[in-house]
Curated annotation (Swiss-Prot):
Matching Pfam families: CHX17_2nd, CHX17_C, Na_H_Exchanger
Physiological role: May operate as a cation/H(+) antiporter.
Top-level taxonomic group: Eukaryota
Keyword Transmembrane: yes
Protein name: Cation/H(+) antiporter 14
Phosphoserine carried by residues: 827
Native source organism of the sequence: Arabidopsis thaliana (Mouse-ear cress)
GO cellular component: membrane
Record family assignment: Belongs to the monovalent cation:proton antiporter 2 (CPA2) transporter (TC 2.A.37) family. CHX (TC 2.A.37.4) subfamily.
Length: 829
């Protein structure tokens, strides 16, 4: 019998064997103790593997969720909450009780939880890799390459110089030097999946800073993987073994990219064609490939998550593969198993065993590498002419760490690369630095500030200054197109008053990590979202062809989390100098007028756009699907349009838009002006500064009505909100479209009693009434964005049209006084 076998026998006789996972000693136990017989038969469920694992998972998930709720106001992420949950449940806090440890974390109960959580983790890492578009490395740009390189090179190089200095100055033991070198490699890295996760949680993934941080992180991670792979391979005993291991791992990556990737793509395309349904994926074959690659990784001496991650990277992100696999696997891997895996790092953390010998030196090196990373990123950003606030925010984002770094810490601790002291310090510092960085980024960076710093563009300004009318139309699906085309037709594009239209297809980000905002022609032709975008674009292009020379359209697609996609809307509106953003209402109506579907995410988008938009915003309540489908094919438009006017900036904006509709020779426009009885009294005093522009606008509409028989002005005298409601209810189905302002003077007697309740405050008091199922016409609720615009201030004075029943060819907003030329209204189409 060999010496090794003899030691094993002696160990078993002492009641212990070498553990199969962490190379530690374990107490021998019966291997059939899996499920309990039940407490009624005298069995203790927590002595069995299955009940104990279920208890551990339940407690970990519940604790991490509670901590996340508590820390959410401080902008902390789920990963931080999960690590804290492990620390609280582990030996650092609750684990000080030996009875608790024997019940909740016995030695025999660790392996089952760790094995299952590792399974979930490598599936999660596969999903993270799946969301990565490897092509963005080529698209990163010189700025991102410079910043990403500086973010990795400075902490890595200065950190190692610090190690040489400490080694020679303090005569550090070799194991401590080796541990510190490992710390430097870890802290120098910035993981692309972690960065995009942080950006998404902070709702800045599709902001300018978010896109730059995304590109910088993938450049930094490319360096990290190269160094980590070489470091991992050449730690082996024996040079030849290290070389062979490196060769075989490289061969595995080549097999993944040049064998597995083409095979999976071929299977996906073949299945989609055979069942004639886009989006279907060969789920079972992909899972078998994933398990095989993960097993091969373990055989070659690297973690199963390594092969899983690179398999994910090799596959196309987004639909159908990215979206389909994410939908099927994310709940199990991310929501159920990942909290257990992350919490295990906290369970292994013990504050009470941190010694005093080299703690200060190790912590100093950790902080130095973080500081070098921050300074390197900030300096490179300043060199690239990035504003100082954004440069600091970017540097803080590059210092954030998460699941990849935690996995690396746990793996190196298990392999004895990191000692317990170093592991504890890394986890604690990671929590503190990431938590502080996230909070400071929220304080320093506000993507909407670039919108607020600009002067606002309004419809009133466009009319007064004779500017081109520029519309940004947001659509989610093909069903939104017909009524949007109706709205364009009603807006009456003409040779002397053309319209520039920018359509934006909004797609919720699924199956990919980075947000995109691109012109339609740059979309991936194999992406199912491109197919839907093409159908949307075709509808608008058909209308554009019917109005050549009077309407020019550009088409864009934005894929981003719905929590922050409002930044794409506002960015495009700012870049294209849009006058009005039109966004669909979050409720969809059936043919009979009842609410068919409600999407709370769309409502949040609308609220964010209303708050941050650089121009006027219109929320469109679409009830004209049947008629709308005819608009694309038959140039059908609404025949009867009403505008509700009470008072205020938004009502004036709605009236200005309706006056453009009134130019259409085939559309009848009725202005319904609500006035209180007191306003008719001769001694009624008005605020001249606030109502002067309204008076000019109303008089202008009245004069326009005198020259066009299809334009009418109707005055309704009411005493309170009850009579206002009665008048509105009497509208019935007389109109195809009603245009109304969002905000009014809430103290107005016209609205008395109506302001106490509102289901949808984003529509205002009157708009909220129109959203009920009692009405069957479409509604456009317009909000004039507050800001430094000409509209509704003292400088805005639309010239009063001459008192004439006059020439119908003369456009009411053109006059000799303003230096404009009269145009022929009936021959300019």
């Amino acid at each position: 019998m060999s010496k090794l076998d003899l030691e094993e026998v002696n160990s078993m006789q002492r009641g212990k064997v070498h553990g199969p996972f962490l190379v530690e000693n374990m107490v021998c136990q019966k291997n059939h103790m899996l499920t309990s017989k039940g407490v009624f038969l005298g069995s203790d469920p927590l002595k069995y593997a299955m009940p104990l694992m279920l208890l551990q998972m339940s407690v970990i998930i519940i604790t991490s969720r509670l901590l996340y709720r508590l820390l959410k106001p401080l902008k902390q992420g789920m990963i931080s909450a999960q690590v804290l949950a492990g620390i609280i449940l582990g030996p650092s806090l609750f684990g000080q009780s030996s009875a608790y440890m024997q019940m909740f974390l016995p030695i025999s109960g660790k392996i089952t939880l760790q094995t299952l959580s590792n399974l979930g983790f490598f599936i999660h890492l596969f999903l993270l890799g799946l969301r990565i578009d490897a092509s963005i490395i080529r698209k990163a740009g010189s700025k991102a390459i410079l910043i990403g390189t500086a973010s990795y090179a400075l902490p890595f190089s200065l950190g190692n110089l610090t190690v040489l200095f400490l080694k020679n100055t303090y005569n550090l033991p070799p194991d401590v030097v080796h541990c510190i070198s490992t710390v430097i490699s870890l802290n120098a890295m910035t993981s692309f999946p972690v960065t995009t996760t942080v950006l998404a949680e902070l709702n800045i993934l599709n902001s300018d800073l978010g896109r730059l941080a995304t590109n910088c992180s993938i450049v930094c991670e490319a360096f990290s993987w190269i160094v980590a792979l070489v470091f991992r391979m050449f730690l082996r005993d024996g040079t030849l073994a290290s070389v062979w291991s490196f060769v075989w791992v490289t061969a595995l990556i080549l097999v993944i990219f040049f064998v597995c990737r083409p095979a999976i793509i071929w299977l996906t395309e073949r299945r989609s064609i055979s069942i004639d349904k886009a989006g279907e994926i060969p789920f079972f074959p992909i899972i078998m490939v994933l398990l095989t690659i993960s097993l091969t990784s373990e055989v070659l001496g690297v973690h199963a998550a390594f092969g899983a991650f690179w398999l994910g990277v090799s596959l196309p992100d987004g639909p159908p593969l990215g979206t389909g696999l994410t939908t099927k696997l994310e709940m199990f891997a991310t929501s159920l198993m990942l909290p257990c895996f992350i919490s295990i790092s906290g369970l292994q953390t013990n504050f009470f065993i941190i010694g005093e010998s080299h703690v200060k030196i190790i912590e100093a090196v950790i902080l130095i590498t973080y500081g070098c990373k921050f300074l390197g990123t900030a300096a490179a950003s300043a060199y690239c002419n990035i504003q100082i606030g954004d440069a600091f925010s970017l540097a803080l984002l590059m210092c954030c760490q998460g699941v990849i770094e935690i996995y690396t810490c746990v793996m190196w601790k298990d392999e004895k690369v990191l000692n317990t002291e170093c592991f504890n310090l890394l986890i604690i510092t990671l929590l503190l630095v990431t938590g502080i960085s996230r909070f400071l980024v929220v304080c320093l960076y506000d993507p909407s500030k670039r919108y607020r710093s600009k002067s606002k563009r309004t419809i009133l300004d466009t009319r007064q200054r004779n500017l081109q009318f520029r519309l940004l139309l947001c659509v989610y699906n093909v069903e939104n197109v017909p009524s949007m085309v109706n709205l364009l037709e009603a807006s009456y594009p003409s040779r002397f008053s053309p319209i520039s239209v920018f359509t934006l297809h909004l797609v919720e980000l699924k199956g990919r990590a980075h947000a995109v905002l691109v012109p339609h022609h740059q979309m991936n032709k194999l992406d199912p979202n491109t197919v839907q975008s093409t159908h949307i674009v075709n509808g608008f292009q058909r209308f554009e062809q019917q109005n050549q020379g009077t309407l020019m359209a550009q088409h864009f697609t934005a894929a981003a989390p719905f929590s922050s996609i409002n930044d794409d809307i506002c960015t495009l509106a700012l870049d294209k100098k849009a006058t009005l953003i039109v966004i669909p209402f979050h409720k969809q109506y059936a043919i009979d007028g009842t609410v068919d579907h409600v999407n709370p995410s769309i409502r949040n988008i609308n609220l964010n756009v209303l708050e941050k938009a650089p121009c006027s915003v219109g929320i469109f309540i679409d009830r004209g699907e049947t008629e709308g489908r005819r608009s694309v094919l038959m140039s059908y438009t609404w025949r009867n349009v009403a505008v509700i006017f009470i008072e205020g900036r938004d009502d004036a904006e709605a009236l200005a838009f309706s006056m453009r509709i009134a130019e259409h020779p085939e559309v009848s426009v009725t202005m319904i002006h609500f006035r209180h009885k007191s306003s008719l009294q001769q001694n009624h005093v008005v605020d001249v500064e606030s109502e002067l522009a309204e008076s000019y606008l109303i008089n202008d509409f009245k004069n326009f009505a005198m020259s066009k028989p299809k334009i009418s002005y109707r005055e309704e005298i009411v005493r309170d909100g009850v009579e206002t409601t009665q008048v509105i209810s009497s509208l019935g189905d007389s109109f195809d479209l009603v245009v109304v302002g969002r905000d009014h003077d809430l103290e107005s007697s016209v609205l008395y009693g109506l302001t106490d309740w509102s289901e949808c405050p984003e529509l205002g008091v009157i708009g909220d009434m129109f959203a009920s199922s009692d009405f069957h016409f479409s509604v456009l609720v317009i909000h004039q964005q507050e800001g430094d615009s000409l509209a509704m201030d003292n400088s805005y004075k639309l010239p009063a049209s001459p008192h004439r029943v006059g020439d119908p060819r003369v456009h009411p907003r053109f006059s000799v006084e303003e230096g404009f030329t009269s145009v022929d209204l009936h021959s300019n189409r």
